[in-house]
């Protein structure tokens, strides 16, 4: 199969999330875990981006002037707050329903986001490039992880960053992120995640480094039931985030 014929889209996953599109912005709905997860991932993105680009994370618009791609943006839970930080944000999702919800909410909120119903490969083929590519809670829902990561890496500008957040493929993750979260705690609808589609860190790092990027940070993320908050952790057995950077010099 030629690379041009490959696709990152798992239509079953697109259909699953399209069916829940109306609930994206409900903090008590089916996407409640993402609402809870947003503060820790936004802080991580802001701080690491500011460190890389020499910005003040405490300023009102620390990402001013940076072009950001939120791939698999869903209803825009991440795109909107990143845009509020001053970034010029493109939110991409293959689901027309998700993009419709995201666009309507952004307009009502007075936030400017360029939402597009497109795939990662369509953006890459069009020659789009970004200072930051956000790949958050997406890779476990795509059809071809290696091709997806390679495609996303192509869009990272020299000196730019790619953030990835997902769930590790471990028995601990199967017990906590799937069985407990979907069947006991009912945080997520059953079937949201499938064990065989979870992704180990090295399966992300390999295509990123092969694409000329350097892995600069790895962190686990865990939920503290006492504080009802997500926090960074050294434990990457369940939820984790990776950060990679392309050299400021053109290397290919």
UniProtKB/Swiss-Prot annotation:
SUPFAM superfamilies xrefs: S-adenosyl-L-methionine-dependent methyltransferases
Any single biological process term in GO: methylation
Pathway note: Cofactor biosynthesis; ubiquinone biosynthesis
Pfam families: Methyltransf_23 (PF13489)
Annotated Gene3D superfamilies: Vaccinia Virus protein VP39
Keywords for the protein's UniProt record, in alphabetical order: Methyltransferase, S-adenosyl-L-methionine, Transferase, Ubiquinone biosynthesis
Substrates-to-products reaction catalysed: a 3-demethylubiquinol + S-adenosyl-L-methionine = a ubiquinol + S-adenosyl-L-homocysteine + H(+); a 3-(all-trans-polyprenyl)benzene-1,2-diol + S-adenosyl-L-methionine = a 2-methoxy-6-(all-trans-polyprenyl)phenol + S-adenosyl-L-homocysteine + H(+)
EC number(s) recorded for this UniProt protein: 2.1.1.222, 2.1.1.64
Residues that bind S-adenosyl-L-methionine: 41, 72, 93, 136
Molecular function GO terms recorded: 2-polyprenyl-6-hydroxyphenol methylase activity; 3-demethylubiquinol 3-O-methyltransferase activity; polyprenyldihydroxybenzoate methyltransferase activity
Top EC category: transferase
Superkingdom: Bacteria
Protein function: O-methyltransferase that catalyzes the 2 O-methylation steps in the ubiquinone biosynthetic pathway.
PANTHER family given in the database record: METHYLTRANSFERASE (PTHR43464), UBIQUINONE BIOSYNTHESIS O-METHYLTRANSFERASE, MITOCHONDRIAL (PTHR43464:SF19)
Family membership: Belongs to the methyltransferase superfamily. UbiG/COQ3 family.
Full protein name: Ubiquinone biosynthesis O-methyltransferase
Protein's gene: ubiG
């Amino acid at each position: 199969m030629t690379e041009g014929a490959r696709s990152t889209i798992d239509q079953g996953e697109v259909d699953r999330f399209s069916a829940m599109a109306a609930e994206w912005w409900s903090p008590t709905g089916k996407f409640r875990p993402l609402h809870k997860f947003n503060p820790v991932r936004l802080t991580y993105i802001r701080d690491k981006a500011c460190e890389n680009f020499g910005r003040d994370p405490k300023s009102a618009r620390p990402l001013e002037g940076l072009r950001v791609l939120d791939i698999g943006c869903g209803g825009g839970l991440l795109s909107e707050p990143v845009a509020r930080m001053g970034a010029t944000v493109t939110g991409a999702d293959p689901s027309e329903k998700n993009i419709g919800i995201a666009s309507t909410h952004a307009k009502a909120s007075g936030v400017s986001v360029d939402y597009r119903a497109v795939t990662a490969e369509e953006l890459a083929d069009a020659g789009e490039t970004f200072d930051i590519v956000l790949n958050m809670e997406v890779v476990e829902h795509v059809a071809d992880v290696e091709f997806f990561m390679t495609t996303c890496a192509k869009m990272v500008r020299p000196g730019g960053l790619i953030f990835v957040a997902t769930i590790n493929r471990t028995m601990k993750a199967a017990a906590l992120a799937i069985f407990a979260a979907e069947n006991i705690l009912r945080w997520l609808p059953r079937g949201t995640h499938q064990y065989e589609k979870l992704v180990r860190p090295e399966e992300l790092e390999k295509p990123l480094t092969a694409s000329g990027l350097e892995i600069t940070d790895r962190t686990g993320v865990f939920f503290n039931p006492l504080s009802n908050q997500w926090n960074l952790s050294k434990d990457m057995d369940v939820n984790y985030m990776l950060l990679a950077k392309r050299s400021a010099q053109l290397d290919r």
